[in-house]
Amino acid sequence: SAASDVYKRQIEYCQKEIVEKYGFQKISHIIEGGAERYHSVYCGLKAIKGADYVLIHDGARPFLDEEIIKRNIQAVREYQACVAGMPVKDTIKISDEEEFAAATPDRSKLWMIQTPQTFSYELIYQAYRVLITSEENTAEPEQTLPYDSLLNKQKVKKLQENRGQVHVTDDAMVVELLTDIPVKLVRGSYQNIKITTPEDLKIAEALCEKKQ
């Protein structure tokens, strides 16, 4: 199909123009992604074999450092699920539909969530498997959804009832939606920025110059 040809060309480009060109040694596989970020994550999870833990990281966050990785690995061994983040610096307002301030949450309890987001492999794989399966069918959950002891059966059923209405924005949310495992917050870094806008790129360039 045309879509398959596009994916094939993209994978070949990544292999030749990025991995081989720059001599990266730690890339074991380049995996075809999906329509949304979380679909791509699931594709990656299915390709992993024999892992105890998995760190899921945004490629748009190039300033990840070794200490953040170490803190994540230490935490996941104890808690099964953790995410990097930092306390917010600004006051946050919740907006209503007309962009008036509806509420002001306690800033001392708010964190900006980053990546990596780190989990026991079996936990995050089973949670994602149910999430993706729930999107792909319209039958009753008892008949169709895979169930694992790591998951909360009532939450699984609720997901199926609300299919199409759940908007997943990070990996921890999948664990929160479908399990009773609390997600530990681990210190990231204010420099662990996500490059999304032209302004972010300018900040990233300044950070690169500082590190040189």
Label the predicted regions:
Residues 2-7:
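Short, small-residue-biased leader/transition segments that mark boundaries at the very start
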Residues 11-26:
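Acidic donor-binding segment of Leloir-type glycosyltransferases
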Residues 23-35:
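Conserved donor nucleotide-binding strand/loop of the catalytic core
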Residues 37-41:
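Conserved donor sugar-nucleotide recognition element shared by glycan-biosynthetic enzymes
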Residues 64-186:
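Conserved core of the sugar-phosphate nucleotidyltransferase
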